[in-house]
C-alpha cells in the first residue's frame, strides 16, 4: 500500500515558513514509527485479532528446523537480529505477520541542499499476513492507526 501525507498547497521555503507549518515528512515519520512498539510488536489496531498463536508443541517442532542464527547474521553482515520480542528469527520469518516500510520519499532529493518544507510525503508499506488474517480487513487497519 502507498501512504501519502499532504500539507501546504506547495513546497515552502523553510526559512520563511519553518516552525509555523507542519512538515509532511516529519508527520509521516512519526506515523511510521508509531506502527511498532518498543518490542517490535505491530500497534495497528486489530492487526493481531485473528492471528492464532502456536502451541508450545508447535513451537518446539519449529525450533527443530535447521536454522543457524550465527550463520544467518554472518551471511547478512549484521551484528544482531531484530524483530518481535518473544519469537525466534525462524518464527519471525515463517509464522508471524509483519509490517514493513519498503520506501519513503518527499521534499527535495536532488544534488546539494535546498531548504524546503515539502507539500507531500510518501511511503510504501507492505504487510505479510498469516492464516486467518484477511487482506480486506487488514488493508483498512493502518488507516485506523494513521487517523488516530
Show which residues each predicted segment covers.
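Short, hydrophobic beta-strand segments
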Residues: 5, 121-128
Amino acid at each position: 500500500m502507498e501512504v501519502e501525507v499532504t500539507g501546504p498547497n506547495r513546497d515552502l521555503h523553510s526559512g520563511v515558513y519553518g516552525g509555523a507549518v507542519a512538515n509532511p515528512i516529519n508527520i509521516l515519520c512519526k506515523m511510521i514509527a508509531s506502527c511498532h512498539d518498543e518490542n517490535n510488536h505491530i500497534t495497528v489496531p486489530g492487526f493481531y485479532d485473528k492471528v492464532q498463536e502456536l502451541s508450545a508443541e508447535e513451537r518446539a517442532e519449529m525450533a527443530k528446523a535447521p536454522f543457524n542464527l550465527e550463520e544467518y547474521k554472518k551471511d547478512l553482515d549484521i551484528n544482531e537480529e531484530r524483530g518481535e520480542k518473544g519469537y525466534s528469527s525462524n518464527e519471525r520469518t515463517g509464522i508471524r505477520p509483519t509490517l514493513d516500510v519498503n520506501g519513503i520519499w518527499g521534499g527535495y532529493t536532488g544534488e546539494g541542499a535546498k531548504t524546503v518544507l515539502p507539500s507531500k510525503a510518501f511511503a510504501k508499506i507492505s504487510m505479510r499476513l498469516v492464516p486467518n488474517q484477511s487482506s480486506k480487513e487488514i488493508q483498512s487497519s493502518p488507516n485506523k492507526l494513521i487517523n488516530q
